């Protein structure tokens, strides 16, 4: 059976097989199939899809701050549509086990001027139920005094659908079709 995972990757599965994204085909029943995603069984008819969706609430200053997972490690983060990449500091990189100085050295322009950062690829970024693999990120030298929260920038956000209504933001993306 062919399935589209994360809205873009076509995978061919037989019952019992698992995709690199963690989707398992349990069984096929004529015009429907049962999948296992994140430990949950989901029955879908042919042509039906499932969407990963996360609802965020703005803090009193209007910022969308949330706990997210980067390479499986939970860190506090803020949605930042003005940031080109997911942005981390050296302390975050250490917690993730990333030797960021092996990344590509880049100059970034920020509200506080130019800074030197290192471009790396994160294996996974997950905000609530919405998860992506291989997301570009930049890591600044320095610690939480310069960049206290991880910035969830456009390298993640451009791959999801983002809707804002008042003080709520919904992030979503097709998970399985």
Where do the model's predicted regions map?
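Pepsin/retropepsin-fold aspartyl endopeptidases
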Residues: 1-177
């Amino acid at each position: 059976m062919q399935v589209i995972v994360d809205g873009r990757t076509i995978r061919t599965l037989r019952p019992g097989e698992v995709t690199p994204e963690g989707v398992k085909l349990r069984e096929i029943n004529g015009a429907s199939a049962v999948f296992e995603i994140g430990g949950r069984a989901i029955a879908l008819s042919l042509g039906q899809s499932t969407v990963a969706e996360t609802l965020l609430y703005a803090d009193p200053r209007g910022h969308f701050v949330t706990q997210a997972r980067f390479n499986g490690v939970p860190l506090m983060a803020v949605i930042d549509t003005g940031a080109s990449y997911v942005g981390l500091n050296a302390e975050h990189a250490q917690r993730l086990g990333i030797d960021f100085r092996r990344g590509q050295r880049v100059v970034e322009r920020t509200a506080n001027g130019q800074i030197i950062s290192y471009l790396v690829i994160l294996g996974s970024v997950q905000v609530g139920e919405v998860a992506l693999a291989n997301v570009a990120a930049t890591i600044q030298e320095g610690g939480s005094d310069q960049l206290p929260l991880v910035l969830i920038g456009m390298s993640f956000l451009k791959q999801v659908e983002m809707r804002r209504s008042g003080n709520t933001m919904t992030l979503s993306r097709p998970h399985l079709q």
